[in-house]
């Protein structure tokens, strides 16, 4: 065990560690609060903005990141028809890319047959205020398309801030 002097010295270090943790947690909480303040106006305000450009997700890029391309686009709406190399349409524009659709595509064609998928993205949404349902995609909390009025900005801010707070513990 500790002697009296060693015990006294260790109590100082323990108290210092606890106060440092409290301060780091406060800083992480402050960051979360600022993120929420900035993004609170971003809401789901329309069903469709009419965007046809979307974001390109490639097989090569997904493999380099260590992710499956189909898993990356699950829960998103297609910005263009999904075609195989022969030109056969596997899924139509504005169709929700679901797990069932991914399974159907994988059963019907070789995975290497599809090199890229164009999806709708919040980054390309054409609305002047807010985000549309088709650019946002699935609400992962409820496993269904997002509803009008959902506070997408606050969800995003909390999704960034919460792990930061956890890392300080």
Over which residues does each language-model region extend?
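Intrinsically disordered, low-complexity regulatory segments
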Residues: 1-169
């Amino acid at each position: 065990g500790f002697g009296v002097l060693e015990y006294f010295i260790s109590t100082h270090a323990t108290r210092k560690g606890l106060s440092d943790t409290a301060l780091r947690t406060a800083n992480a909480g402050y960051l979360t609060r600022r993120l929420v303040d900035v993004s609170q106006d971003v809401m789901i305000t329309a069903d469709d903005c009419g965007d046809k450009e979307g974001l390109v997700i490639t097989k090569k890029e997904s493999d380099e990141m260590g992710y499956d391309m189909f898993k990356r686009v699950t829960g998103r709406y297609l910005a263009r028809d999904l075609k195989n190399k022969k030109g056969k349409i596997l899924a139509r524009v504005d169709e929700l890319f679901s797990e069932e659709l991914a399974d159907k595509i994988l059963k019907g064609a070789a995975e290497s047959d599809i090199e890229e998928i164009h999806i709708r993205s919040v980054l390309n949404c054409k609305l002047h205020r807010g985000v549309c349902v088709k650019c946002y995609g699935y609400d992962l909390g409820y496993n269904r398309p997002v509803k009008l009025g959902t506070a997408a900005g606050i969800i995003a801010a909390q999704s960034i801030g919460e792990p930061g707070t956890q890392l300080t513990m």
